[in-house]
Amino acid sequence: MRVTGKGSGRVSIAGLVCLKPGQRPRLIYRTRVFRGRKHEPKGFAEPDYIALLDRAHQRLGGNLVLVWDRLNTHLSAPMRRRIAARSWLTVFLLPTYAPDLNPVEGVWSVLKRSLADLAKRTIDQLAAIIKSRLDRMQYRPELITSLVAKTGLDLRPP
């Protein structure tokens, strides 16, 4: 999400839609604000994604099966090494450019629609609103379930 005008910047978001049999679906996310400062990271790198996965593992417990898009950071050699070091993590990749199969893309779509009519704000105000909207989504399991259902993927355990 970008903000234009004085004090512009960007809010980057990385998220996971998590399903565990017998539990409500979960949305786990991280945000990063970029204010345009020199040497400030503009987005997420491998360590950030791994920290998100580690957090999901800690919150959910047990092994994780990750169905991931083909973002270049997700496919990099450093990321593959980090994933290989986690015996509890199995990764399956979605086909190239398949946002319709990724429930997280549905989360971003719902979020963006909810932000469409906002007046211009500062980047910090925008970041706070984004976190608030994502926090609300975390407590709407029916929404997360519907976003998974829209993908058409059968994610039930065998």
Task: Identify what each model region corresponds to.
Residues 1-158:
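Short functional hotspots at interaction and active-site rims
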